Amino acid sequence: MAATSQVSSLLDLIMSLLDTATTYQHQESVKNEVAESLKTIGSHQPNVLLTACHQYLLQNPKLGAFKRAFVLQTISICVDNCEVVSKLDEQIIMLIINLATQEMNMTKDTDVEWAESSMEVLVTLAKNTRFVSHVIDAILQKFPPGQTTSPHRYIVLTMATIAVHNPFGLVPFLTDILSRTVPLLQHVKTDPLRCAWARAICSFCEAVRECETERPKEASEEYIGDHSRPNSASGHCQEVSNRATYSDQTEAVYDVIFSWIYSKDPKTRGEAAECVGELCLMIKQTRLVEDVKKIVTNMIPLYRKSYNESHMITQGICRFLEAACVDETCPLEPYLEDILNALFPNACLDPDDTTVTLSTQAIKNHSEAFRCFDVAATRFADRIVYYLLHKMQNVADSQKLGAINVLRHLLNATGQHMEDKRSLLTMGLKKLLAAENTTSIRVKRAIVQLCVALADHSYVDAEGGDYVIAFLVRNLVGPTEQESAAKKVEVDVAGLNQLRTQCAQALYTIANTCVCATKLLWPYLLEFICCERYTPVVGDLCKCLRTLVSREVEAGRKMDYVTGFDNPKVAGRHAVFARLFTSFCNAPLNGLLTRRAREAGGLIQAVAPWFHPSMEGPAARWSEKLEPLLDELSTTVSSGDSAPAELRGRKIARWHEACLDWLSACVAVVPEGDWRQDLAAAMGKQLDMYKELSDEKSFLLRCLGVTLARITAKQFVIDHMMLMFKSASHSVLTERQGCARGVGSIATSHMDLILIELENVSKWEHARKSSGIFGFIKDTMPIRQYPDIEMIHLRATLMLCYGHVVMACSLDTITQRLQNTIIVFLRNYFANSKQETVVREAMLETMRLIATAVHPSRIGGEWKFEARNELLAYAKDYLNGETPEWLTSSLRLLACKTTAALVQLEPPLSPADIEDIGTVLTRQILPMQREKSGLKTLAFDIFDYASSSVFSTFSGSSSSHTNIYMTPPLTANSVAEGPNGTPIHQRHRGIGGKMEDDESATIMDATMHQYGLALEQIVRMAPTTQTIMILLKILLPYYGKQADHERIRAVDMTVLVLRVYYECAEDISLGHASDFEPLSSLLGRLAPRLIDLLAHVRLQALSAIHWTLRLAYMHKGHGRDADQSLFSYSGFVEKYLTSGDVKLEGQKEKLAIEAIAQIIEYRLPQSQMQIYLSAIFEMLTDRQSHVSSAAAQLLTYAVMARGATLNAEAEILVTKMVEKLADIHHCVQTNTDVLAALVAFAVHQQQAVCDVLFKQPLPYSINITDAWECLSRDKLLFAVILDHLTELLGASLDQPFELMDSGGGVSAKVVNVEPCTYVAVLAEVVKNGEPESALMERLPLILTLLIHFICSVSDTQFPVMQKEGSKNPLIITPDLRRAAEKPAGMAVAAIKNLLNRTRSNMVIEDMNQARAWTDCLDKDSFIQAITVFIRSLVEQRPAWVSPLAKTMEEYANSESEPRRLAAVIIAASLIRRSTSENGEFNEQLLVKCIRRLEDSLTDPSLRIRKLCVKGLGELSECSSTDVISRFVHMAVEAAMSGLDDHGDRKDTVAIESIMALNKLVQLTNNDQLKSILPLVLLKIRPCFEKDSHTLRAASFSLFGELGSRVGENSEEFRGHLHTNIVSLLLHLNDDFEEVRQNCANSIYRLHGLLTSPNASICIERELKDGKQPASYNLFIKDFASILANSFPDRINQYALATSNYFKSSSARIRCNAAHLTGCLLDGLTAPLRATISRELVFTGLVALLKDSEDVNVRISATRAIANLHDFH
């Protein structure tokens, strides 16, 4: 439609909407809105819409396919509305039906959307019984009888779709349809048409069957020659008239459709196959019998020809099977094999296979194939079972899986048909179950699931159950690596685990429930229990065996240990006993091992008589002691009355000791030595079974050692000891430990023999190095040849063996054997510090075991171990070879444990030795920060064997020694006080607490724990001050380390050393006073650490200080008596240091430092003051700012307290503090604290300090800022500094800037340096100046100067460079230009500081809300900002106003424009409210301000004149009516004159004039308003549409004000209101918030003038109190309707006025106009609709539909047109 065409009807509008949709078809938002609008119109005027769509399609024959589809979709949506069906005109519907059929016939094969849209129209109409006959008639018109050419493909599909959606509507026409179809089908040649006809016929058949289901009728006819007709696959038959009605026609159709199976198109073949299947349910049974061969032989090959159509083919076959299997009449047997072969590949698909992505059709086909087997099984179950069993023998996994899954499905789904096939299934599955490991895991898992199904249906019995058992047992374990490598397939670990779990569960189920379980499983399972391959499933086998024995015992039967045990594959009793005991290894470690041990123990107890008749008694200890112990150790939380939670390693060690004790008891009760030797031999043979299981092998070595200790045959012992060395993998730590501990167990009974053999083992290494003629010695070595690396590990094992042999030595011979034999032998190895790490670790462990073995608490007496220092030297040598930061082995941990054990021996270490060993340990341990991965497991192994059970050797010794050794290091999480108030730190030994090495997070933590034990033992052995000073000297350098872990470790060790010294000090005498030398150094370095970032360091530092002061008190001769004056540790912590793991709050930090400073001042001797201050100065540069701040505070307290004694050093002290300011600038608090000391000195040199600070560059550095702040806090300095500053600032403002030539005739104002400097200083000193009274006296002058500064520099800038030749230092730096942006920003900062100082927070808040601080920097907005500031002072600080105004009076007549401007700003700001000091009205001040503004109306400055008009406008808000009445006329005249100000080129004064008039009209009498009203209304009307949004907002506001004053009595204004109401409504949703708000306020104030109650109610509800509506669109919808109903005579005026805005420059206003138009014209009565100028309005809306700028305009126009549905 052309843009100039006139639009006058709804039909034209609908045509325009359709044109819009087709034009902007790619804009989905527009297209969707048009569709929604058409839907709305269609719901009200469906016939008009349908007529329009009909005409549109006819008038636009060249419209594109997608566009025509949209129109048809619109029709479909309209007629699909059930509410409008009754309104539809039947003639129009007939036109639409014909149109749709014509459109459908016009489509081509590629126009899918167009054709489907046409079909959707017809189908939608056909769903309704009213139109279905018309639709089908129209379709049949396109399909006349006798036609040899097929109708359009979509005509056929339409009939098919109607059959699906309305079968009852189509079936009455089906005879006619089929009568036309039958002769036509043979002429259908194209594949798409054949597909369509096949689909249609399928739908017809389904419709007939659905009608039978919904409306069953008795047969009115009987089949000729047939007695029944299949009705379902279940075999029920009924005579159904409906099918019989169409049997002849369907047979004719069947003949033609069947021929389509031979089509070349795969889709056609698939559709034809499904259709043939459906027809099989419709044709006569006799015809089906005749065509069985034909159907099968033609449908089966389709799978190969039409792969993608498999689902349709399968559906056809399923329907055919339903018809054929209903009874025995159909001869299907000869073809069953072919059918199953065709269906089976579809059943072989695995929907659960994640490696293959199956389509939805493939999954449906899979399910349909299963259904086919279900249907066929109702008649041919035995044939199907044979078939599936045969398929299971196929080599392809998919075939096997398919057969297994189908069989399982049949067992579960059609069990009644499979009951008589039990023997057939059992025999048929034997071969599958007996197959070797050539079957894939997936197939095996499927077989296991089949076995479960067989068991569920009681198919597993004595007849063929052994095959099932053999299969399950065989698949309990996966293939070996060799087998997997031979197959060259990737091992599916997850699948193997699932298979193993399924097999184990199936075996247990059989053992627990099957009646013949004993016959099947006993002793068959014993063949596998000792097989290496079955090691991972020993627990499962034991569980089954134990269950069998338990069932036999419960049944009162005895186990048969004879029958079947002659089988060589069945393991013997000794082998089983050894295997079961090995299964106890590491049982408490995890659930799997616990379950294995539990089952093994239960089996030992159950079959104990089999092992030996005398073993039944000891075997009972399993349930009496060991099983309860296992339950206790396996729990992670101990009970309340039990021992504390134990460690994993200690749990395992305790468990292993208990198991070995049980083993020893079991062996001991057997008197026959041969039995013992047989058991040891069996253990030796099983060592090779655990090549890959080091833990189990290690435990078995220990078991073998315990067993050999009970054997007296020496040669047998020697042979098996050699076997232990031969079998152990010495490169594995656990096996080395197991071998060594096993040898130690043997040594308890064969000490001399073991020592001799160990020496022989040591010679193997030397024999290996021999060559030449001595090479024959290699052949005589009793074990295999070791390479170099293995020989190294063998040496490590040998070293460990000696350590455990020493532990096994009897107490009466240990010292002699140690000195004469063992040490002499080991010294040759110990002396070589260059050996490999593994050997050094073993030697350190051996040293520790030796020291433990000869500990005085163990052997008694005062025997001295002369080689102790020698061993310590070896340990130091080993440590020195390590890298401090990098932890790569357990050597340091073992060195600490060795040191802790050695230093406990006599004689005590010398000071030099203490320093030496302490330095080496600390240097190598404290810096540790990284560790090698895998050390955690390594540590666990070490702790299990090397630590856990060692102390049990002398556990019966005095408790004091045990506690001394086991005391853990300190932590921050456990704080308490002892009897004397001394802090005690202990690790929690309760639930979940860390206790020992192997429960530490890392081996690094375990190493630190052992390091602490070593230091503790050093102090306990030499508890003197000298020892403490040596150790503290080593630890002090680590207090200030940056690394957290180093500080933590250093203070932890410090506390540990001090605490142990306090407990054991020997150099303290009662009554003898002496200085505790470490006191000053410790206090100076630890006191600042009280506020360390780490809570742990804080608490430990306080603990160290407490211990230090306690020790100092002891050294005064008081002994360990309580010092009543010493602070309480817990009280100090609770009061100052309780902050959890986060850092302390600032106030708490200060209080803590103050408290500790007072304590230090009281307790630190003057003789140690110099050392204390030196330490404090070192701490000022600590890496942690909080700590350096604390040091500065301590320095301040020290200077204040003892300044009299430091007079001579005062200058040097202050100089150093100033120098430190630059070093500690990163720490603000430290600066502050150092400056606190500086202020005390600055009082005497105040002038010099000020002069220096004045010359500092701007902006001031943090140091200078802090200095000014400190100076201003001094009460003597503050007033003097203020007076000096104000005098200098006032003088500098006479010439605040200079004009700089920028080139090109352009100059710039550059601010001078002096005003900036003084303002910057003023901003600093007013922050915290004291006293406040001095500031308040000078407050008016300060404010005046700052406001003057802003007015003076508002349009200036900072100098970019310094003047040439200037010798003054550079003050205005680039940093200042970046920070302050503009010079006025410096005054803003000063004002803010002043307000903060005077606690005028509300003034700041007022400025923030108005964003006035930012406006102060803008040359156009600073006046408004100052106004906000002054008015806030009037409200919040009225006492400041009068002095400020008085100070400004002398500026009023100044020649300087900034001074006059400042005076006018103050005067204008005080018009609204002028107050006295007490906050009351000050008329005198107000009059002065008004006169000042009146006098300034003629000022040369435009901004001053503008400000005067604005200020006089504020007179409306004055509280004095007298003053208002005196000056309102003058103010109004001033505002009116402002409208015609000749210098006002940008309407700025005009805007202020309108604003002023807006405020003054309410104060003017009616006569005066009436006199100015015409002029104001004339002036204001054009302002509504001005580009300036501020002017628009002011105009709307003034219009509202005028109306509220004179509108009620002025018809002239009422007329203007109706004229302008459209503008108000449209701008209510203006682009700018201010305009929107003013419109809302004006409408709210003027609604009474409309004299419409409904309008008033609506406005009061939606625009309550002048607020904007919550939803503009909803408000306009309601209000427009009210306007139309209230003023029907003006409705056309409103519509035309609104249409004028269709061409607005604002897209939002155009949107609003369209929306308002739609709402105004919605729902009008017919008479009112007749008054509307349709052509203008409708044409405008159509033009908006084509808006090219904004899509929202087109959407709004579309929505508006939807509301015009009644304009038809």
From Swiss-Prot:
Name the GO cellular-component terms. Answer: cytoplasm; lysosomal membrane
Which GO MF terms does the UniProt record name?
membrane destabilizing activity
Show the InterPro entries listed in the entry: ARM-like (IPR011989), ARM-type_fold (IPR016024), HEAT_Maestro (IPR055406), HEAT_MROH2B-like (IPR055408), Maestro-like_HEAT (IPR048465), Maestro_heat-like_prot (IPR045206)
Question: Which SUPFAM superfamilies does the annotation name?
Answer: ARM repeat
Q: Which GO terms describe its biological process?
A: lysosome fission
User: Looking at the keywords, is DNA repair present?
Assistant: no
HEAT repeat intervals: 4-47, 164-203, 816-856, 1166-1204, 1483-1521, 1731-1768
Which Pfam family is one of this chain's hits? HEAT_Maestro
State if Membrane is listed as a keyword.
Answer: yes
Q: Main localisation, per the record? A: membrane
Q: What keywords are annotated for this sequence in UniProt?
A: Lysosome, Membrane, Repeat
Which compartment or compartments is the protein found in? Lysosome membrane
Could you describe the subunit structure of this protein?
Answer: Homooligomer; homooligomerizes at lysosome scission sites.
Q: What's the family?
A: Belongs to the MROH1 family.
Protein task: Lysosome fission factor. Recruited to lysosomes by rab-7 at scission sites and homooligomerizes to mediate the constriction and scission of lysosomal tubules. May sever membranes by inserting amphipathic helices into one bilayer leaflet. Lysosome fission is required to maintain their steady-state number, shape, size, composition and function, and to accomplish regeneration.
What name goes with this protein?
Maestro heat-like repeat-containing protein family member 1 homolog
